[in-house]
Amino acid sequence: MRYLTAGESHGPSLTAIIEGIPAGLKLSAKDINEDLKRRQGGYGRGNRMKIETDQVIISSGVRHGKTLGSPITLTVTNKDHSKWLDIMSVEDIEERLKQKRRIKHPRPGHADLVGGIKYRFDDLRNALERSSARETTMRVAIGAIAKRILKEIGIEIANHIVVFGGKEITVPDKLTVQQIKVLSSQSQVAIVNPSFEQEIKDYIDSVKKAGDTIGGVIETIVGGVPVGLGSYVHWDRKLDAKIAQAVVSINAFKGVEFGLGFKSGFLKGSQVMDSISWTKDQGYIRQSNNLGGFEGGMTNGEPIVVRGVMKPIPTLYKPLMSVDIDTHEPYRATVERSDPTALPAAGVVMEAVVATVLVTEVLEKFSSDNMYELKEAVKLYRNYVNHF
């Protein structure tokens, strides 16, 4: 499976082309729109979420509610584009109109300045538009398709916020993936402990009032993963490495860990490694999951537990100092529309990219032209593992 996305934040639309989805997968626009709606939710989101109400158009690769095995084309219209017709015009326009929304005061923490230098832009909007988190709309759409495949082969995925701007959320022990999914979806701030709900909302309100932003830590958990996805044979086939790359590719993500993650560096080996046992009913199991479901770059049958660290959103309503790229004089950074936090939405994106990587790996191991063959291959493999 592979894909490309295209489109600018305030352009006419966003597009994705996905190749490698097996034929026979039940799929409708509704399946994708549900996740697009989740991405636009969460406490603290701004006015653009009220403008867009994203709806996907499937223009190829699906017929009568089932995939055809051919490339799937997805499009999401940017409803806000009607207000940007001159600024985002494909054709050349008058110089005075170009200057109307030109960006020359780069925002610290964004791609503005470095993108302008790299591509020789005198209007930093050219970098801003594509580097915007608006692009993640299509990655969520792609992830929605990936999750449909995972569900068909008994793999489920969920996410929740574990740290909100320095405030750590106490997570109840031994929650299942399904329980996490339900609890997180019932929370406006995507947490699984309702006793923290109002505290986090009040905190977001105070941050917004101060013109500031906050980041945090998001945890994604995947259950029902077969043993042996990924490989130890080559560095670039390690599945945890592929997931790490995908997570850090999300806008504003600055770190990733699995299981105990960085805490492992403060512990002894006897405190970290997961003891192995065997039962007739379950086969090989671990007595703990400190390694987050991975050994040697391969899944070991335990749930995948991966956390991503999201920095605070760089666009500040009380902007930091920057420089005018024309005069090189000190200047306040440009202010674009922004939110105090986007953690709940980022959790949906993280869930999507993890699902996409997993499906790509599944389709590589169990190469199948159609969903029937895929499900049979996975079933046969699971049976083999249970009797190893």
From Swiss-Prot:
<keyword id="KW-0028">Amino-acid biosynthesis</keyword>
<dbReference type="InterPro" id="IPR000453">
    <property type="entry name" value="Chorismate_synth"/>
</dbReference>
<protein>
    <recommendedName>
        <fullName>Chorismate synthase</fullName>
        <ecNumber>4.2.3.5</ecNumber>
    </recommendedName>
</protein>
<dbReference type="GO" id="GO:0009423">
    <property type="term" value="P:chorismate biosynthetic process"/>
</dbReference>
<dbReference type="Pfam" id="PF01264">
    <property type="entry name" value="Chorismate_synt"/>
</dbReference>
<keyword id="KW-0288">FMN</keyword>
<comment type="function">
    <text>This reaction introduces a second double bond into the aromatic ring system.</text>
</comment>
<keyword id="KW-0285">Flavoprotein</keyword>
<keyword id="KW-0456">Lyase</keyword>
<feature type="binding site">
    <location>
        <position position="39"/>
    </location>
    <ligand>
        <name>NADP(+)</name>
    </ligand>
</feature>
<dbReference type="GO" id="GO:0009073">
    <property type="term" value="P:aromatic amino acid family biosynthetic process"/>
</dbReference>
<feature type="binding site">
    <location>
        <begin position="130"/>
        <end position="132"/>
    </location>
    <ligand>
        <name>FMN</name>
    </ligand>
</feature>
<feature type="binding site">
    <location>
        <begin position="311"/>
        <end position="315"/>
    </location>
    <ligand>
        <name>FMN</name>
    </ligand>
</feature>
<dbReference type="GO" id="GO:0010181">
    <property type="term" value="F:FMN binding"/>
</dbReference>
<dbReference type="GO" id="GO:0008652">
    <property type="term" value="P:amino acid biosynthetic process"/>
</dbReference>
<dbReference type="InterPro" id="IPR020541">
    <property type="entry name" value="Chorismate_synthase_CS"/>
</dbReference>
<dbReference type="GO" id="GO:0005829">
    <property type="term" value="C:cytosol"/>
</dbReference>
<keyword id="KW-0057">Aromatic amino acid biosynthesis</keyword>
<comment type="pathway">
    <text>Metabolic intermediate biosynthesis; chorismate biosynthesis; chorismate from D-erythrose 4-phosphate and phosphoenolpyruvate: step 7/7.</text>
</comment>
<comment type="similarity">
    <text>Belongs to the chorismate synthase family.</text>
</comment>
<feature type="binding site">
    <location>
        <position position="296"/>
    </location>
    <ligand>
        <name>FMN</name>
    </ligand>
</feature>
<dbReference type="GO" id="GO:0004107">
    <property type="term" value="F:chorismate synthase activity"/>
</dbReference>
<keyword id="KW-0274">FAD</keyword>
<dbReference type="InterPro" id="IPR035904">
    <property type="entry name" value="Chorismate_synth_AroC_sf"/>
</dbReference>
<feature type="binding site">
    <location>
        <position position="337"/>
    </location>
    <ligand>
        <name>FMN</name>
    </ligand>
</feature>
<comment type="subunit">
    <text>Homotetramer.</text>
</comment>
<keyword id="KW-0521">NADP</keyword>
<feature type="binding site">
    <location>
        <begin position="251"/>
        <end position="252"/>
    </location>
    <ligand>
        <name>FMN</name>
    </ligand>
</feature>
<feature type="binding site">
    <location>
        <position position="45"/>
    </location>
    <ligand>
        <name>NADP(+)</name>
    </ligand>
</feature>
